[in-house]
Amino acid sequence: MTTIDLNCDLGESFGAYKMGNDDEILPFVSSINVACGFHAGDPSVMRQTVEKAMQHNVAIGAHPGFPDLIGFGRRNMNVSANEVYDYVLYQIGALDAFVKAAGGKMQHVKPHGALYNMAATNPEIADAIAKAIYHMNSSLSLYGLANSEAFIQAAEKYNITLVQEAFADRTYKQDGTLTSRTEENALIKNEDEAINQVLQMVKEGYVNSVNGEKVAVQAQTICLHGDGEKAVQFARKIYRIFERNKISICAPK
């Protein structure tokens, strides 16, 4: 039976502002990435998200981003590798404290937004992220864009496990990178198209680029976004379609 991880970015509410559909999404995913306060989230939200994740027995990971609350961590920043290292180490250490306090164990780290996209093509950024993970806890996995040489090389250098990730509702360029969110065609808004893309990636190992060319994708985890208007409906549908196709949903071991 084919096995795949379904992950989702959660814990992105901040103070009085609610973001996402965390409670409703949790039953349909196998791992979550918790915002750590830089691009979203706050200490109380981090604690509550960890506690809910443990109740649902899903794998918990840190979701560090750039210090950019107003831009939700989606804007590129001109930063050094040392700054990236500091940002990531600080954030994963903070989440790890909440996980340990709740009696759990953190499983992975997935960079957020612009940090993720920059790391996918910038070896220095990817190296800084992997180095922070290695120094924090080398048993933590790194979730990174499938086929990214920068992520692959950084994980190999520090001997940490790379979990290659694909996206359910994002379009791909010919080189295998994600279409920028500044482009009109960055998101797949049709639910059936997104589901077909996921099945194509999981069962056949490729995705159609925006140019119509096939791009090889060997994904071990699929990201579902939890903040869309129909996010819960989509997650439930993916979950049931996987069941019908005998695709097991399980966090990486």
From Swiss-Prot:
Keyword field contains ATP-binding: yes
UniProt-recorded Gene Ontology molecular function terms: 5-oxoprolinase (ATP-hydrolyzing) activity; ATP binding
The entry's keywords: ATP-binding, Hydrolase, Nucleotide-binding
Family of the protein in this entry: Belongs to the LamB/PxpA family.
Enzyme class: hydrolase
A GO biological-process term: carbohydrate metabolic process
Function noted in UniProt: Catalyzes the cleavage of 5-oxoproline to form L-glutamate coupled to the hydrolysis of ATP to ADP and inorganic phosphate.
Protein name (database record): 5-oxoprolinase subunit A
A Pfam family per the record: LamB_YcsF
InterPro entries associated with the record: Glyco_hydro/deAcase_b/a-brl (IPR011330), LamB/YcsF/PxpA-like (IPR005501)
Enzyme Commission no: 3.5.2.9
CDD domains: LamB_YcsF_like
Reaction it catalyzes: 5-oxo-L-proline + ATP + 2 H2O = L-glutamate + ADP + phosphate + H(+)
Plastid keyword on record: no
Gene3D superfamilies with a match to the protein in the record: Glycoside hydrolase/deacetylase (3.20.20.370)
Top-rank taxon: Bacteria
Summary of subunit composition and partner proteins: Forms a complex composed of PxpA, PxpB and PxpC.
